[in-house]
Design a protein with these regions (language model features):
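Serine-esterase "nucleophile elbow" of acetyl-processing enzymes
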Residues: 1-68, 214, 220
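Alpha-helical cap/lid subdomain in secreted, periplasmic
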Residues: 74-248
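Residue- and microsegment-level detector for short, conserved "hotspots"
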Residues: 71
Length: 248
């Protein structure tokens, strides 16, 4: 089983359908904030699952905070029937400043853009959040939270790979940096992010004012991840059921 989580870049937003959320499509309003299924079909996660011949589950949501990503990843793993040694988790991290707020029993995702749709009860709090974002503090907070998830997955002996979509951890001081082994793709460099890789390889955003890439770019990232997985010997052998994971 390949389980992926992240924000719009993992949800495949706009990859082939203009709607990021299923609910934006009049025919799919009942699906709420799930990714539009047309986009999931061509997303890097789905394409990678086809390459490694594994079943697939996408838990990503456009505009998701890393708090949401961590919460939903742990919830899914704690409830899955998939044996942990047959599971590969890949997460593309969101921007560091985003937050998740629980308001009237509903989770909301907020960034520092200042244009989020916020319930009246929390508009003042949101304005304060946008005005006072401390990027250094948010960067270190994200780093520590991701380390905790990594350690949790390690303790469960679950294979996992992390990568940065937009932001990176170059601002983390050398003394505070850990060696992630194969578990984190280039966490400390500008050119190690998802968008930097695609930009440097000539893939354009779907429109001039979009943050998102098309199906061709998602396929390219899937091929990059496959090469990474094979080179790091996360997958080592092939049998009748497909590629097998090397247990470390």
């Amino acid at each position: 089983m390949l389980y992926v989580n992240g924000d719009s870049h993992t949800a495949g937003a706009e990859a082939t359908n203009q709607h990021a959320f299923a609910e934006d499509d009049p025919n799919l309003e009942m699906l709420g904030r799930l990714p539009h299924p047309d986009n999931v079909k061509v997303s890097w996660g789905k394409k990678l699952s086809e390459l490694i011949k594994y079943s697939f589950f996408c838990d990503a949501e456009s505009a998701a905070s890393n708090t949401r990503i961590i919460r939903t990843t742990k919830d899914w793993i704690e409830n899955t029937k998939t044996p942990y040694d047959e599971l590969l988790v890949i997460i593309g991290w969101s921007t560091w400043e985003r937050e998740e707020w629980l308001i009237d029993s509903e989770y909301y995702q907020f960034g520092a853009s200042g244009i989020d749709d916020v319930p009246d009860s929390h508009k003042d709090k949101y304005k304060e959040f946008v005005s006072n974002v401390d990027w250094k503090q948010k960067t270190y907070e994200a780093y520590e939270n991701i380390k905790k998830l990594h350690n949790w997955l390690e303790n469960l002996k679950i294979k996992h790979i992390f990568f940065n979509c937009n932001n990176n951890f170059k601002k983390i001081k050398e003394k505070d940096r850990m060696n992630w082994g194969y578990n984190y793709i280039s966490p400390y460099t500008d050119n190690g992010t998802y968008d930097a890789y695609l930009d440097s390889n000539g893939y354009d955003k779907v429109t001039h004012n979009s943050w998102h890439y098309g199906a061709d770019a998602h396929a390219a990232w899937a091929r990059f991840l496959l090469k990474y997985i094979v080179e790091k010997k996360i997958i080592t052998t092939r049998n009748s059921s497909g590629l097998k994971f090397n247990r470390i």
